[in-house]
């Protein structure tokens, strides 16, 4: 199932809203969209987030042309505009971590 940009940002907004409502910390995983980067950069403090290496390494549609189904993952690899914004976040210390996304499946 493809997770759209709208799904990603609406879920991220919901997490932040719940954390603020209950005055709790939250760490948001697998950020992949420029909308999430922009939103989360305005909600630092109790909210931290990660970007995964694969989303900093390849971008769509090139990755699907070159790698086929090996590039399929969830959340999906997005286009270069999202890739560029993720790198902007890394270069400007906006994100808090780069997560391994380590999930071995047999």
Name every feature range the model reports, one short phrase each:
Residues 1-98:
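Histidine/acidic residue-rich metal-binding segments in metalloenzymes
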Residues 100-106:
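Active-site anion/phosphate-binding pocket segments in diverse small-molecule metabolic enzymes
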């Amino acid at each position: 199932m493809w997770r759209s940009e709208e799904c990603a940002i609406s879920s991220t907004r919901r997490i932040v809203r719940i954390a603020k409502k209950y005055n709790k910390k939250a760490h948001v995983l697998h950020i992949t969209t420029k909308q999430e980067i922009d939103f989360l950069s305005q909600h630092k403090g109790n909210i931290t987030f990660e970007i995964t290496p694969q989303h900093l390494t390849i971008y769509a549609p090139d990755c699907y042309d070159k790698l086929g189904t090996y590039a399929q993952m969830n959340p999906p690899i997005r286009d270069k505009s999202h890739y560029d914004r993720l790198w902007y976040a890394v270069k400007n210390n906006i994100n808090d971590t780069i997560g391994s996304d380590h999930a071995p499946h047999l």
